[in-house]
Swiss-Prot record:
Species name: Candida albicans (strain SC5314 / ATCC MYA-2876) (Yeast)
Single GO BP term: nucleoside transport
Pfam family, one: NUP
Lineage, top ranks: Eukaryota, Fungi, Dikarya, Ascomycota, Saccharomycotina
Signal peptide: 1-22
Function: Nucleoside permease that transports adenosine and guanosine. Does not show any transport activities towards cytidine, adenine, guanine, uridine, and uracil.
Gene name, Swiss-Prot/TrEMBL: NUP
GO function terms (MF aspect): catalytic activity; nucleoside:proton symporter activity
PANTHER family the record matches: PURINE NUCLEOSIDE PERMEASE C285.05-RELATED
This protein's name: Purine nucleoside permease
Amino acid sequence: MKLSTLFTLATTISTLTTFTIASPVVVVEKRAINETALAEDIPTTKNNHAQTSYGKPFAIYQPKAFIISMFSLERDPWLKAMDFVHNITIPGLSPVYPDIHCTTNYTICQITTGEGEINAASSISALTLNPLFDLTKTYFLVGGIAGGEPNYTTIGGVTFAKYAVQVGLEYQLAYEDYHKTNPDWISGYIPYGTDDQNTYPGNVYGTEVFEVNEKLRDRAVELASKVHLNNGTEGNAKFRKLYNETAAQGLPKVVKCDSLTSDNYFTGNVLNDYFANFTLLMTNGSATYCSTAQEDNATLEVMTRLAKHGLVDYDRIMIMRTISDFSRPPPSMSAYEYFFNRSDGGISASLENLVIAGTPIIHDIVQNWDKIYESGEKYSSKNYVGDIFATLGGKPDFGKESFDTA
């Protein structure tokens, strides 16, 4: 290479080594060859906390409503009902469900996370952190199927939650290991940091309880209550009659009650009774357990962390679960017989009712965006919203004054 060419190349590189980009501004200055950074070159500062600015200046998608499904059976009714014409693939989504689906103008989008807490947290993190999506004003509808507590709902029923309670973060002993020493225990679960099932956990991880916007939940319930739900099959109707509870025997309806999160798929009277009590304990008597799910607390933990930095608005999240089956057996069946050999008429009503009950609030958001939903003021929360740590501010109406973090 000629010296003149080498000099030209070096000049070009020198010019390019000083550059700036927006949000945050980064400046890289060229140092002379063999120059050493001495102590006097380093400015004195008392702030050793590295920080960055937040925002997505290059985002091209700003959906008004986002539907969150967990697996294909929950996703497919939405794909059939909505005019999703765009498929968007971003890094970090489930390898089973790698696409986000959006309508023509990207006003409504849908994501499928994969089942379980890890899949939900991973996929929602990938979505909310992706620079292509500006989700600061987006409303999220978590819409999935769940097991139902027959005291409050039935097969095909629709539930909208104010609280999501994670029941798996506990000690656990096998029946053989506790029934002689603690015959009064309901189950082998014991809250962390205690040796008593009726004592609030002594230490927490922070994901045990989430509370969402009650006013927005109530608006979704108001709209969903005006539509005609799918009542299910003849088999559903016959199976409902095996229960003594009025709610279990009745036709599907929309109810306000709360969701449990557990990776472990449980059933039976023993665990249902314990987790119902645990729900009351964790929420200071405020929550009413009626649906069993596997993802909600994981999704809400991601939303909480991102809301703290302004990337999503936690006030704009709704949790809807439709009931595919009962979480405990009818009196005529054992838990084992019910779980492995039942014929309850199928889950088609719960899948259809995801769209039937979820569409009204989605359409309301889109149709009244400019007048109501963009600002969010009309349905802004009056209750506490967030986690047990008060990450988003305010004072939780559950928990206790202090506990150890684990």
